[in-house]
Design a protein with these regions (language model features):
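Gram-negative outer-membrane beta-barrel transporters
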Residues: 24, 390, 395-396, 458-464, ...
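N-terminal periplasmic "start-of-domain" segments of outer-membrane beta-barrel proteins
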Residues: 30-61, 86-89, 103
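Extracytoplasmic beta-strand/coil segments of soluble accessory domains associated
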Residues: 67, 71-110, 114
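Short acidic/polar hinge/loop motifs at secondary-structure boundaries
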Residues: 110-138
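Transmembrane beta-barrel wall of Gram-negative outer-membrane proteins
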Residues: 166, 173-203, 212-253, 277-294, ...
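Face-selective signature of the C-terminal outer-membrane beta-barrel domain
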Residues: 238-239, 281-480
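Membrane-embedded beta-barrel scaffold of Gram-negative outer-membrane proteins
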Residues: 290-292, 298-316, 508, 514-518, ...
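Structural signature of Gram-negative outer-membrane beta-barrels, strongest in the C-terminal barrel
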Residues: 379, 391, 395-410, 439-562, ...
Length: 741
């Protein structure tokens, strides 16, 4: 199977190459019509915090994991889970990291989470290895992007249609039977037609090992993109169609390890997770139209449709007495089992050694005692967004006005199944398949209208950027009985209307130094839970930017003053709550500072020694006491917000001479509390990870590269949710070739 996939990928690449060899091999430059910022130079001009990571920067390490890319942006927090970034946990400026559900995720400036309003957890994430740029906007800069505006937005830019006929093939192999192929070909004709063909294939057996099993713990990802465009010469019109399809088959689990087992073998997995597997399928259609009324006034219109299906079959818990049918299962979470062993406590009359024997597979369990759930969900996210941009001069002020409106609808449809198994001789045996819908039978839906207006006003050395966003959201959840027959059970609704003002200011002291300040009201929708308020915070930032030659420095302090911090129950949170419910967390405060320094230390004209430092300090805590809740637990004022490291930094140094380049990075992240109580075994380890990459440019067309991730083979607990200690990825060596034509 794997060999056939590799041959298929190489065949696709070869076919693209053979067609392209007859075409001109001129260099092309990417279009930037789907970006928020467009370049790092443009980011420095904004009256708010923003960062741009372009293609050249991405190629230094050629990562396929968004978490290893995004960590270089100050203010970004990451909770490692599977080691590959398949379903990443990313937060910005202290918002919750879980499933990246508190930041606005976009691909090509279009909402990309499976259901951004009704179910924002990112169980789909774009294949990072095919992207051409990454953008992060924070503070007042994020007011044009919603619905999550407290932390900010992450926009992923896909491969643009080349301006001339050109192609690219990247092939790499690595440890754990890993391979990756990325191939593109396309261009534009003199008549105005353009096209792009693209495929990305990625496979690995995984870096973890399941007890007494040959089952892999890796992934198998296929991704295909087609773009067609028409922009006639001497015309003010342009149209582009994007079609994208991706599927994934990965053997990922929520079941972690006890601390003692982690210390003995960090990359072990209990055989109880042998059947755990997630399969996903994603389809996207985007139609864009642009019209230039004049050189200063342009209109854009985008219609989009995203459809996503996922089926995650994984172990959920244990009923120590066993259940004759799957509907009567009395579940104890694996988290409680792991914690009982960690704390040397009994659980349901079982001693720690008896519990350990169950995890080890050394003890048989009663019939129907192990629960596995088929977490089947279908999503759609669709809508239309219009934009109007005007650049002009009024008196002695210049204006860049952006007006946008988005009409959006999304839905999550759950029809899930609990099945009962028993553990016999260290392996799982099915006892009762269960009745479809016994683990969730509901549809939640959202209709939203979002409007924003933003104006960059330049007066002398000043740039003043006021903005206003309006969100009108209607949400509904309907629950059903009787499986696929779906007889009505109950429903609930919630509606939200909110105005979100913001203001950013930049003062250009001189050609090298600028000062920035800003404030805006941030917002997160409250889901469909009645009586739950929206998450709101007043956000402030203040800092400066300095650039002189190759030296660039940015220091920004930020403060988020929450009126109400929101908690949303998901399976990955590990909390004892109903999945999909939201909870008020009352007041909280997040304060911090972001530092970014880059320079070139070389004194020779033919050598570059680029160095950079990205540092983030964050302090987040609850401001009020909260009685015991299913999500937050018991909270006292001053308790820390979970998964927020106080200190983190990424330092890098490179060496570039003629056709050779090498880069070394070191990433440090403080330990974090995984729950507000921060009791024993509720903290991660601090960690320092080193990556090394090198490449050699043999010609304009051929580049060879190699990469070592986790050079020193660190083994640290980077997560404990939902069911035990989780590791970072082991040391991994990869080699690849990049061919341009």
């Amino acid at each position: 199977m794997k060999a056939n996939r590799l041959l298929l990928s190489l065949a696709i690449s070869s076919a693209i190459s053979s067609v392209a060899m007859g075409q001109e091999q001129d260099k092309w430059s990417p279009l930037e019509t789907v970006t928020i910022i467009g370049s790092q130079e443009q980011a420095r001009r904004l009256a708010g915090s923003a960062h741009f990571i372009g293609a050249n920067k991405l190629q230094q390490f050629s990562y396929s994991d968004i978490q290893r890319i995004a960590r270089e942006v100050p203010g970004v927090s990451i909770q490692i889970e599977d080691g590959y970034g398949l379903r990443p946990n990313i937060g910005i400026r202290g918002v919750a990291t879980e499933r990246s559900g508190r930041i606005t995720l976009l691909e090509d400036n279009v909402l990309i989470a499976p259901a951004p309003y009704s179910a924002p957890s990112a169980y789909y994430f774009p294949t990072v290895g095919r992207l051409s740029a990454i953008e992060v906007v924070k503070g007042p800069s994020a007011i044009t992007q919603g619905p999550f505006t407290i932390g900010g937005a992450l926009n992923m830019v896909s491969t643009p249609i080349p301006t001339e006929m050109a192609g690219n093939i990247v092939t790499e192999i690595g440890q754990d039977s890993t391979y990756r192929v990325h191939a593109t070909y396309g261009g534009r004709t003199d008549s105005g037609f353009g096209f792009l063909l693209e495929t990305h294939q990625w496979q690995s057996d995984g870096f973890q090992n399941i007890d007494r099993s040959n089952q892999g713990t890796g992934l198998d990802v296929e991704d295909y993109t087609v773009k067609l465009s028409y922009a006639p010469l001497n015309s003010n019109h342009e149209i582009e169609l994007k079609l994208q399809y991706a599927n994934q088959d990965s053997d990922q689990s929520y079941l972690g390890l006890t601390d003692n087992d982690f210390d003995n073998s960090a990359f072990r997995r209990y055989r109880l997770s042998e059947l755990d597997n997630i399969q996903t399928e994603h389809e996207q259609q985007i139609l864009r139209y642009g019209y230039a009324f004049s050189s200063s006034l342009t209109l854009s219109a985008t219609a989009y449709n995203n459809e996503h299906q996922r089926s995650w079959f994984k172990t959920e818990g244990i009923d120590f007495d066993g259940s004759s049918n799957a509907q009567d299962f009395d579940r104890t979470s694996w988290f409680n089992v792991v914690q009982a062993i960690n704390t040397d406590s009994t659980l349901n009359g079982f001693t720690p050694s008896q519990l350990q024997a169950i995890l080890d597979g050394a003890s048989d369990t009663p019939a129907g005692s192990i629960q596995l759930r088929s977490n089947d969900r279908e999503y759609y996210s669709r809508g239309v967004q219009l934009g109007l941009n005007w650049d002009g001069v009024i008196g002695n002020t210049t204006h860049n006005v952006e007006f946008g409106i988005r009409i959006h609808q999304d839905e999550e449809d759950r029809l899930q199944l609990n099945s009962n198994y028993s553990q016999i001789d260290g392996a799982l045996a099915l006892d009762d398949l269960g009745i479809l819908g016994n683990a969730g039978n509901r549809v939640q839906k959202a209709d939203a209208i979002a409007i924003h207006i933003h104006n960059d006003i330049q007066v002398g050395r000043w740039t003043i950027s006021p903005g206003l966003r309006y969100e009108d959201i209607e949400q509904k959840r309907t629950r059903y009985r009787d499986g696929e027959a779906r007889s009505f059970r109950d429903s609930r609704e919630n509606s939200t209307q909110v105005f979100l003002p913001g203001l950013g200011v930049l003062y250009q002291v001189n050609d090298e130094l600028s000062l920035i300040a800003g404030a805006h009201k941030g917002f997160t929708a409250p889901s469909n839970s009645p009586g739950v308020d929206e998450e709101t915070a007043i956000n402030y930032e203040l800092g400066f930017r300095y650039q002189s030659g190759a030296l660039s420095t940015e220091l920004i302090g930020f403060l988020s003053d929450y009126d109400n911090i929101l908690g949303e129950c998901t399976a990955s949170s590990g909390s004892d709550c109903v999945i999909g419910d939201a909870f008020n967390g009352d007041a909280a405060t997040v304060a911090g500072a972001e530092l970014l320094i880059s320079a070139d230390l070389a004194s020779s004209s033919d050598v570059n020694i680029p160095v950079s430092l990205s540092y983030t300090y964050i302090n987040g805590e609850f401001d009020t006491d909260i009685a015991d809740t299913d999500f937050f637990g018991s909270v006292s004022a001053g308790d820390p917000l979970p998964y927020l490291p106080d200190h983190q930094f990424l330092a890098s140094v490179g060496f570039e001479k003629n056709n050779f380049a090498a880069y070394l990075t070191g990433n440090y992240v403080d330990e974090v509390c995984v729950r507000a109580s921060c009791n024993a075994f509720e903290q991660t380890d601090n960690t320092f990870t080193v990556d090394l990459a090198a490449n050699y440019q043999f010609s304009a067309a051929l580049n060879l590269y190699a990469r070592i991730e986790n050079l020193t083979s660190e083994e640290d607990i980077l997560g404990r949710q939902p069911y035990g200690a989780r590791p970072n990825k082991d040391r991994t060596v990869t080699a690849g070739v990049r061919f341009n034509f």
